[in-house]
Amino acid sequence: MPISIPLNATLQYSSPSSSSSSSSLVPSSPLFSPIPSTTVSLTGIRQRCLRMVTSCVSNAQKSVLNGATDSVSVVGREQIRLGLPSKGRMAADSLDLLKDCQLFVKQVNPRQYVAQIPQLPNTEVWFQRPKDIVRKLLSGDLDLGIVGLDIVGEFGQGNEDLIIVHEALNFGDCHLSLAIPNYGIFENIKSLKELAQMPQWTEERPLRVATGFTYLGPKFMKDNGIKHVTFSTADGALEAAPAMGIADAILDLVSSGTTLKENNLKEIEGGVVLESQAALVASRRALTERKGALETVHEILERLEAHLKANGQFTVVANMRGTDAEEVAERVKTQPSLSGLQGPTISPVYCKRDGKVTIEYYAIVICVPKKALYESVQQLRAVGGSGVLVSPVTYIFHEETPRWSQLLSNLGL
């Protein structure tokens, strides 16, 4: 079953047991042959490009084993540090999101890895690799970070200090999934259960999986009761591993699935490890111990929520004749798409007739999603609305964002 990371969750995984046994990456008798049209050149392939995983924990990760947290003091630094991806699509999308929330990241020099947000004067921005954002949250060098949930799961490894503040920033969507060839002995395999039950996998000849996720991969297999499996890491181009005969399957991030299809690979039922997208993550210790950190998170969260809530929403304004506001409200409420956020706002429109101020129209203001926009306009017309104005909504601020209340509860505050 897929690994889910709920809102404000403390990521708690048990570290999979390692095996001391080793096996050859390339068996003398492969279980299937590459498709005839596949030609793979091994020229220039270095030994380090494919290696057996003997340990998935580097020195920088020792503090996250089994959810343990080294005692790292958060005192001695006044600035709140926000980690952002340093390059790629995630980096651009993170900056765009903050800009949409009126948080402008200012770099004196684009080659510098430190920046400021004038709207948050006590906050520094540090541009880092996604995996280093997670590591530095754990070490206390960062307080907040925007990173994919897949990276949080892989490099956080269940550390209790990591807390997810907002799990759905609406970019970086993908999923971590197991993929197998669509030919040879796998041609008729359609599910993880069928893959696990294949008689070919034994202790001497386990299922070989190439992946860059050396924590989530073994954990997923263990959770699903698949015993005869071994993992290897590759420096990119995982899709070529099965055709080269050096892996039976791959475990990698999938967006559209086009790359898998072009390399004669397929996903299988039950093979999704994790659904991922960009998330706002924080250090529990920083939020509870560093002065100003919780207030900064509150402001960032409110801005994010207001912008994301307004995404795809439109304000519709129309004038309608009526005897009084209640009578107009009764007509409006008969239409299913005119309820708004809490209900329609109805206010009098004051007109001057023969030197006197009179009320002949009432203005109706509602908020509707984009998919229901035209239908709402038609329904307003049906009950007497005219002069319909439509404008996009930029922000929707509630009394308090539910995620803030959940965060405080998760922190025990």
Curated annotation (Swiss-Prot):
Targeting signal (transit peptide) range: 1-57
Cellular localisation: Plastid, Chloroplast
SUPFAM superfamilies, per the entry: GlnB-like (SSF54913), Periplasmic binding protein-like II (SSF53850)
One GO BP annotation of this record: L-histidine biosynthetic process
InterPro entries documented for this protein: ATP-PRT_HisG_long (IPR020621), ATP_PRibTrfase_cat (IPR013820), ATP_PRibTrfase_CS (IPR018198), ATP_PRibTrfase_HisG (IPR001348), HisG_C (IPR013115), N-reg_PII-like_a/b (IPR011322), N-reg_PII/ATP_PRibTrfase_C (IPR015867)
Reaction catalysed by this enzyme: 1-(5-phospho-beta-D-ribosyl)-ATP + diphosphate = 5-phospho-alpha-D-ribose 1-diphosphate + ATP
Superkingdom of origin organism: Eukaryota
Protein name: ATP phosphoribosyltransferase 2, chloroplastic
Gene that encodes the chain: HISN1B
